Design a protein with these regions (language model features):
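Sec-dependent signal peptide cleavage junction
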Residues: 26-49
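Outer-membrane beta-barrel proteins
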Residues: 69, 83, 130-136, 179-185, ...
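C-terminal outer-membrane beta-barrel translocator/porin domains of Gram-negative envelope proteins
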Residues: 211, 217-316, 322, 328, ...
Length: 387
């Protein structure tokens, strides 16, 4: 028995065939998209076009002093001259986050290498309306002394280096900072201390630098050495509490290939601030996501900071790697003696660009455990290597 008229039956069959064709086409498109994404993000083949790479990550977190944090972090890696086979990777990074307590943090950075690596330009523009935890000065501070301090920072930093010899660069730099600081707790150690700069201030730093760099790759180094000296002076331009002195920064790195896929990476730093007037916000801070991972940045702070770290890197696949690291460091001054504390942990690496060796870094690190306190630790997600 024919339930549908013949014309309607033909129309139904035609519609069904069209639906099957569209569904099949949709499946093919979906498969093509999956294949393209798989090739782009998982393939072990390097892009022969030497094109740039772009990555965006969500920035989500929670802390008692900020509430819920949300935003984006992005990185663009490229060559300023793709025709130069020896040119180094240039990078532009942009990050912006907000919080449920109306705080904000914006940072734009560039690291540019020109043709033949003749010139190297670094810049940073930052606005930060963000609280930080203050524990005191020196290495003998305690979690119980933690105090929230509100801070607004505006920063502009420019640096230019010129090649003067084989792997050797000389440079000049300028940096302007404007700090606005406030603490509502009059009975806490921050307001009761004799610190300089408790309400903020501004500073202009003029400096010179010397760099030796023969690393094989600036994004993920597997062999070579890096040594940089930076000296910057802040003249007395504004109020009597603004910084008037000198910043000295030394950074040494070595990368030793132990195997085709295994690298031992080493780093040592020394940072010092000295002069007639040194505001507390210019003191050197231990911790963060680059050196002495596992410690809150500023958990220990003083006029001098000395630290070193070693990282064993195993890149078992062109797209993936694992690392283990350890470090030791301390702040110190004439008033406060040094007390070296450990840092150790491990992490995963995903390389989103094989051409530029650009990576996403997942690290978890531990620090010391002071008497009566929990062991200090931290998780880090970043769009670059620690060093």
């Amino acid at each position: 028995m024919q339930i549908l008229p013949q014309s309607l039956s033909k129309l139904t069959r035609y519609t069904a065939l069209c639906a099957l064709f569209i569904a099949g086409t949709g499946d093919l498109k979906a498969q093509n998209i999956i294949q393209k994404l798989s090739k782009k993000f998982l393939s072990a083949e390097k892009d022969s076009t030497r094109s740039g790479s772009f990555m965006v990550l969500p920035a989500v977190g929670y802390a008692q002093e900020t509430g819920v944090e949300y935003g984006l972090a992005s990185s663009y890696n490229f060559y300023l001259d793709r025709s130069d086979p020896y040119i180094r990777t240039s990078t532009m990074t942009l990050m912006g986050t907000f919080t449920s307590k109306h705080q904000s943090n914006f940072k734009f950075q560039t690291d540019l290498w020109t043709k033949n690596n003749d010139y190297h330009f670094v810049s940073e523009i930052r606005y930060r309306n963000w609280p930080f935890n203050y524990y005191g000065i020196g290495m003998d501070t305690w979690k119980a002394d933690e105090e929230r301090v509100d801070q607004k920072l505006f920063r502009v930093k420019l640096e230019a280096e010129k090649k003067i010899g084989h792997n050797l660069y000389s440079g000049i730099n300028i940096q302007y900072d404007n700090f606005s600081i406030r603490s509502d707790s009059s009975d806490h150690i921050f307001n009761q201390s004799n610190l300089i700069g408790k309400e903020g201030g501004q500073q202009l730093l003029l400096g010179v630098s010397q760099l030796f760099d023969n690393r094989d790759n600036v994004s993920y180094s597997t062999r070579g050495y890096y040594a940089k000296l930076r000296l910057a002076y802040a003249p007395k331009l504004w109020t009597r509490e603004d910084f008037n002195g000198t910043n000295l920064d030394l950074d040494f790195r070595g990368f030793i290939p132990l195997h085709q896929k295994v690298t031992l990476a080493l780093q040592g730093i020394f940072r010092s601030t000295f002069g007639k007037t040194i505001p507390f916000y210019n003191y050197r801070e231990l911790g963060g996501d680059m050196m002495m991972r596992g410690y809150y940045l500023g958990r220990y702070r003083d006029k001098n900071y000395l630290a070193s770290q070693a990282e064993l890197r195993y890149r078992f696949h062109p797209r993936f790697g694992i690392v283990g690291f350890s470090g030791i460091g301390s702040t110190f001054s004439k008033e406060n003696s040094s007390r070296y504390v450990p840092s150790y942990g491990g992490g995963l690496r995903y390389f989103f660009s094989l051409e530029h060796n650009s990576s996403i870094r997942f690290d978890y690190s531990y620090g010391e455990q002071r008497a009566g306190e929990k062991r200090q630790s931290g998780f880090y997600l970043s769009l670059s290597e620690a060093f």
